[in-house]
């Protein structure tokens, strides 16, 4: 006989019995002062060790600041005319079964032609194109849910669901430690 590979649940949205209630991202981060990745002055709080974030360049800040909770910047809509029916980004399996990001996601508003606040890069000829990326890249966390798993790349806005739920930045190291519950213990680094 083999053991179970999936551990028994310990938490739930609506706990019963011995289960504990989920801890949301907002609850975990409630005691941290706000930061902003727009400039150096607002990107750290000297009172809390490791509570600092990388500064985003102007384009990345534009993408992040227009990304709603639970959504990816690849789905951002037009900030000029307010048109909100531009196609959103998707992942598709190719004929070999490999998951590939869509090549049809528009970079310009279908109504007014303005560039959308979506991750893009400049080609050698000076034209812009949408960056390659999956639907979890440049994605803002949802404040009312538990945090998604954090990877070693959590300090990059393009990393999987690592944009702060309501501030224009990624998580600080201090916040990542809190989400992983490491800040609940005394460590000497």
Predicted segments, located by residue:
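C-terminal target-recognition/interaction regions appended to catalytic cores
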Residues: 43-189
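Flexible, glycine-/basic-rich loop-and-beta segments that form/coincide
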Residues: 1-42
């Amino acid at each position: 006989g083999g053991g179970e590979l999936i551990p028994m649940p310990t938490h739930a949205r609506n706990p019963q019995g011995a289960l504990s209630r989920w801890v949301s991202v907002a609850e975990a981060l409630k005691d941290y002062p706000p930061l902003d990745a727009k400039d150096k002055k607002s990107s750290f709080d000297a009172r809390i060790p490791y509570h600092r974030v990388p500064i985003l360049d102007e384009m990345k800040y534009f993408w992040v600041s227009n990304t709603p909770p639970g959504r990816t910047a690849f789905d951002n809509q037009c900030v000029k005319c307010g048109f909100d029916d531009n196609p959103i980004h998707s992942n598709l399996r190719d004929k070999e079964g490999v998951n590939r990001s869509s090549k049809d996601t528009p970079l310009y508003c279908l109504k007014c032609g303005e560039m959308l606040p979506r991750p893009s890069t400049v080609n050698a000829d000076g034209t812009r194109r949408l960056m390659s990326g999956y639907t979890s890249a440049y994605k803002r966390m949802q404040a009312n849910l538990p945090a998604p798993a954090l990877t070693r790349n959590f300090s990059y806005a393009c990393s999987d669901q690592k944009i702060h739920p309501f501030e224009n930045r990624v998580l600080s190291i201090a916040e990542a430690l809190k989400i992983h519950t490491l800040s609940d213990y005394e460590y000497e680094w």
